[in-house]
């Protein structure tokens, strides 16, 4: 069994799993679905494409720095309406994520993709870019 380690750090992160409508919450650590989305973006997998190849990964998360919960009062406008949302982020948090897989070649492919991503990478939400040196 081989493992690929990722250091997830950035000014803000948001790992929402029950975010709906006006309130967008975050978990205290990266979610498996959030990390899967990050990996899919790195690999260039489109939203409508199959991501089952990522199901073979086992995930573990270590919190190296908890960070602080940040609340953002957010307004957005369309032609007809204004929307007010409250979004929560983790500020200055650092996590070490371990991805375990029996297929070492697949982990090497992921490592390359994370160093040369097909799409921009984010820590949960589009407004959350990662620091350099994730892998």
Predicted regions and their residues:
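Charged, low-complexity intrinsically disordered regulatory segments in eukaryotic signaling
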Residues: 1-7
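Short polar catalytic/cofactor-binding loops
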Residues: 8-14
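Short helix/loop capping segments that flank catalytic or ligand/cofactor-binding pockets
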Residues: 15-16, 108
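Internal, well-folded beta-alpha domain core
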Residues: 64-135
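Glycine/small-residue-rich interface belts in oligomeric ring/scaffold proteins
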Residues: 2, 16-79
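Structural motif
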Residues: 12, 58, 94-96
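Residues in well-ordered beta-strands of folded domains
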Residues: 7, 60-62, 98
């Amino acid at each position: 069994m081989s493992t690929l380690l990722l250091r997830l750090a950035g000014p803000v992160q948001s790992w929402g799993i029950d975010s709906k409508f006006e309130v967008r919450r975050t978990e205290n650590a990266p979610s498996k679905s959030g990390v899967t989305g990050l990996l899919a973006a790195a690999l260039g997998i489109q939203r409508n494409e199959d991501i089952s190849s990522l199901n073979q990964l086992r995930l573990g998360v270590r919190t190296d720095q908890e960070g602080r919960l940040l609340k953002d009062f957010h307004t957005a406008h369309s032609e007809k309406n204004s929307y007010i949302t409250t979004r929560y982020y983790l500020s200055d948090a650092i996590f070490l994520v371990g991805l375990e897989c029996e297929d070492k070649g697949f982990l090497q492919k992921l490592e390359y993709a994370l160093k040369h991503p097909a799409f921009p990478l984010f820590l949960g939400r589009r407004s959350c870019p990662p620091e350099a040196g994730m892998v």
